[in-house]
Amino acid sequence: MDSFKFIQKKILLLGSGELGKELVVEAKRLGLEVIAIDKYENAPAMQLADHSFVINMNDKKTLINTIKKIEPDFVVPEIEALSIEALKELEEEGINIVPNARTVEITMNRHKIRDLASKELNIKTANFSYVFNAEELEMKSSEIGFPLLLKPLMSSSGKGQSLVKRKEDLLLAWEDALKNSRGKIEGVILEEFLNFDYEFTLLTVRKSSGENVFCEPIGHEQYKGDYQCSWQPLDMNESLINEARNMTNKILNNLNGSGIYGVEFFVRGKEVIFSELSPRPHDTGMVTLVSQNLNEFELHLRAFLNLPIPKISLLKPSATRVILSEKESINPSYTGLNEALEVENTKVLIFGKPTSKKGRRMGVVLSSDDDLNIARKNADKSASKIKIVS
């Protein structure tokens, strides 16, 4: 690729959170121009981008007009709260959507990705059923059985998800799901509650050649569907890893767009069960900032820019622990940073979000050690020192 033309590449980031911020860091290292968009001012990625705009990305006309005005070489969605119709129309006009508009549409909707995996590709998932009105709730929940998970068909970061243990709690969970739903679809998915042994993310890079390249599995823990900690590598049976890779190949060969994908699985005994997929850097994959020779943000850029991707190797066992806010505040400040940074082989990332609220992810601790257990303990210890204050 001609280096002068490459330097002139312009990337438009739709969504400007902490994952987008790290993508901007890597893009600027390659001399790229980055424009960041979000629904609020001073979002994390905006703080590093060349230019930024605040718009309603769910408004089709606004999103189309903004993208046409900017004239980017690549449009890179970092969130799911956006107009898919706008992306589809722009792609038809020749604008590069990463990885492609169809993939963004399928993966943002639990109905579409579950049907693709389970019904079309015959990939094992938890038992599930869709519900589009409250009258169907009791009947379909009895078919799944209690306890069950109730999730909006469109949401992210665990918003609107409930563990329902009895039918008396169904209506409340239904209302919470609809309140936290994104997009125009008013419906939920009921899922069998799996008594799984562990869950993991398989970061997978799809090259423009169609080759899929796998990172080492990343173990993670969630609370109400939201990531709390992760670690790499995950000690698991090679046959289970191969099964997850085979499932991932099936899905990505169907979606067929270049970039990095975070593919989530459950393991129950000798079963590997597909959970979800994100066509972008994954929150659990922030561990790769210290664990791998090429982190997930570098890999995403290299893939959709069609740049070389040499062998991905593990540098050292590593772990993360998120820093959560316990209160609401504007322009939050932090205590305990000195104590957190005293922990050996540990880094602290403060995302720079302009406001905090209870349970909001405000930062993450990264830790590495030859002993994975020590890395995990150090990440937990460091994160526990930091408190968000007004």
UniProtKB/Swiss-Prot annotation:
One of its GO terms (cellular component) is cytosol. ATP binds at R110, K151, S156, S157, G158, K159, G160, Q161, E191, E192, F193, L194, E199. It comes from the Bacteria. SUPFAM superfamilies: Glutathione synthetase ATP-binding domain-like, PreATP-grasp domain, Rudiment single hybrid motif. Keywords: ATP-binding, Ligase, Magnesium, Metal-binding, Nucleotide-binding, Purine biosynthesis. GO terms for molecular function: ATP binding; magnesium ion binding; phosphoribosylglycinamide formyltransferase 2 activity; phosphoribosylglycinamide formyltransferase activity. The keyword Chloroplast does not apply. N(1)-(5-phospho-beta-D-ribosyl)glycinamide binds at E18, L19, E78, D283, K353, R360, R361. It catalyses: N(1)-(5-phospho-beta-D-ribosyl)glycinamide + formate + ATP = N(2)-formyl-N(1)-(5-phospho-beta-D-ribosyl)glycinamide + ADP + phosphate + H(+). The keyword Nucleotide-binding applies. Belongs to the PurK/PurT family. HAMAP family: PurT. Involved in the de novo purine biosynthesis. Catalyzes the transfer of formate to 5-phospho-ribosyl-glycinamide (GAR), producing 5-phospho-ribosyl-N-formylglycinamide (FGAR). Formate is provided by PurU via hydrolysis of 10-formyl-tetrahydrofolate. This is Formate-dependent phosphoribosylglycinamide formyltransferase. It comes from Prochlorococcus marinus (strain MIT 9515). The lineage of its organism: Bacteria, Bacillati, Cyanobacteriota, Cyanophyceae, Synechococcales.
